[in-house]
Regions:
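Short N-terminal edge-element motif at the start of the domain
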Residues: 1-46
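Short beta-strand segments
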Residues: 23-25, 212, 250
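Broad, structure-driven detector of short, well-ordered beta-strand segments within folded domains
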Residues: 25-26, 197-206, 214
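Acidic, aromatic-enriched beta-alpha/helix-loop junctions
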Residues: 36-81, 205-246
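Intrinsically disordered, low-complexity, charged/polar segments
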Residues: 48-173
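Negatively charged, low-complexity tracts enriched in Asp/Glu with abundant Ser/Thr
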Residues: 174-200
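Short, compact, well-ordered microdomains
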Residues: 239-269
Length: 269
């Protein structure tokens, strides 16, 4: 017989990061506005595997993000596990968090059909357990709020991904306005193809800052750029932060990036 899984508001869970560290999140509410899904708050910080937290002290930590998820799936798959509980839910802070969604279709009463629309012009927002508010285009009030986040019900994979890296690899419309920020210790590798310029970019970030970049030109040459060698043959190292390009880039492995870098290091045109 399958083990009965019981979760209660206040429960605290641990996510093992796979690099000798672990992090924590707490189940703090159910959101009737979003399918009565579980709302969690993930805490800033990673801890050695032998660390034994004081739960009442842990919940006083800075909140990294809020999210909706299905706790049971993560528990059944051993993606997180319960380690304790606390009555401190931080609900005053949750009340100020904005959840964001967007619509790609809207109902047209004249035709009794749904019309396709631009999601970038049809955002809606809400606070936990409050009505959704259509806002049209994204506004500074929402995008610049410190706790604005994707309001979808996230899979266990997306929850763990964001806890581990500080961001998710999902391509979200929201990311055009709310920049993703990796943890300072995270190394990220991304690639992006500029169809207009016919240039393929490969990026290596340390935290939010660019470390290395490889550009494949339209004629098949490769340009290696770095902090120590930021300009070459009319090309310059990317000067923005991670969040400036993460919404339109695909992840690649560090192994693939380094293979490309090493293959063309010192051989640029």
């Amino acid at each position: 017989m399958a083990k009965r899984i019981v979760t209660r508001i206040g429960d605290i869970f641990c996510v093992e990061l796979g690099d000798g560290y672990k992090s924590y999140f707490q189940y703090i509410a159910n959101d009737m506005t979003q399918l009565n899904s579980s709302v969690i708050r993930a805490f800033v910080g990673r801890y050695p595997m032998d660390y034994q937290p004081d739960m009442d002290e842990l919940v006083k930590s800075e909140v990294a993000f809020y999210a909706h998820t299905v706790l049971r799936i993560g528990l059944v798959g051993d993606h997180w596990y319960k380690v304790g509980k606390s009555k401190d839910l931080g609900l005053d802070e949750l009340a100020s968090a904005w959840f964001v969604g967007e619509s790609s279709t809207v109902y047209n009463p004249e035709t009794d059909k749904f019309d396709d629309v631009d999601p970038l012009e049809h955002f809606y927002v809400w606070h936990c357990n409050e009505s959704q508010i259509p806002i049209g285009k994204m506004t500074p009030e929402i995008s610049e709020s410190p706790m604005t986040t994707n309001g979808s019900v996230l899979s266990w994979f997306r929850i763990v991904e964001r806890i581990k890296y500080g961001y998710t690899s999902a391509d979200l419309y929201l990311n055009r306005y709310v920049k993703q920020k990796p943890w300072p210790w995270v190394e990220s590798y991304l690639t992006y193809f500029d169809r207009m310029a016919r240039l393929r970019y490969y990026f290596h970030f340390k935290g939010e800052k660019i470390s290395r970049e490889v550009i494949r030109t339209s004629d098949g040459n490769f340009i290696n750029l770095s902090e120590n060698d930021p300009e070459k043959d009319g090309y310059a190292l990317f000067t923005g932060s991670f969040g400036d390009i993460s919404w339109c880039a695909w992840n690649v492995t560090g192994e693939k990036f380094n293979t490309i870098w090493d293959k063309h290091h010192g051989k640029e045109s």
